[in-house]
Amino acid sequence: MNEKTARQIAEMKNQTIGVEVEMNSITRQRAAKVAAAYFGTGRYENTAGRNGYSTWSAWDADGREWKFQKDVSIAGPDEQKCELVTPILTYGDIETLQELCRQLRHNGAKSDASRGCGVHIHIGAQGHTPQSLRNLANIMASHESLIAEALKLDRSRMSRYCRTVDPRFLEQVNRRKPRSMAHLADIWYTSNGASYGRSHHYNDSRYHMLNLHATFTKGTVEFRLFQFDEPTAERRGGIHAGQLKSYIQLCLALSQMAKDVRTASPKPQQNENPKYAMRTWLLRLGFIGEEFATARDFLTRNLTGDTAFRHGRAAA
């Protein structure tokens, strides 16, 4: 690994993280109790009066509040519509989050697109500028189809809750080249037809794979596109700790790349060999070595093609 890549990975890991995992088949009270037991604090309580959303909360040993909230978009009985909302995390907290998700799964929690469940990942917007966020929009636009294929994204979710970058936003942001966050916000909301209620949580502009509404209202860059695999004859599907870590690493890397590059193009990647395209892109993102082996596997396993040869292997 060269010095530039090592620095890229180190800076990537310095970003803050927030994660939302939607699930059902477990009540919010039960999920909070499981979390409190795992944290070793035993502290959990109903915090709906303060947090709304029929919330139950659990606290870890550092006094951080982990929330389990009701989200009406989740399928199933109301008492089992459960969304885990983490406190602000660092890279070193990922293993804690992974083990908590394992504990929730062992206690019956289920999550996949057929249940109306997704995974949303927030990366702290510190260090981002109008130019870096423009870069990020272009990076996403050029890779969204590849990512959707790699993750087998549910098409109904893509049409409603995690749409691709709006072409009107893409055209305007690249033509007008905003130099201030206020100007970027104006372009974001007007091009998405959502100038009303900019401060409202449920502003319609949020329903994109890349959600900059969160940037302007919460100080984070939100990636809303993720989901766990649905069960098959070969796999159990559902909540998977390794898959979750892979998603977090990808979001961190995307955010860092947007900061590092001078400009980025929205032109779609080659698609004659998707597996090769994904592998080479992941290497540019810094996914090198054993630490990123699981992510490389999850992000290429569903793609067709050859990871080693762009135009396929020569016949013997």
PLM feature spans:
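C-terminal accessory/tail domains of diverse enzymes
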Residues: 1-113, 126-316
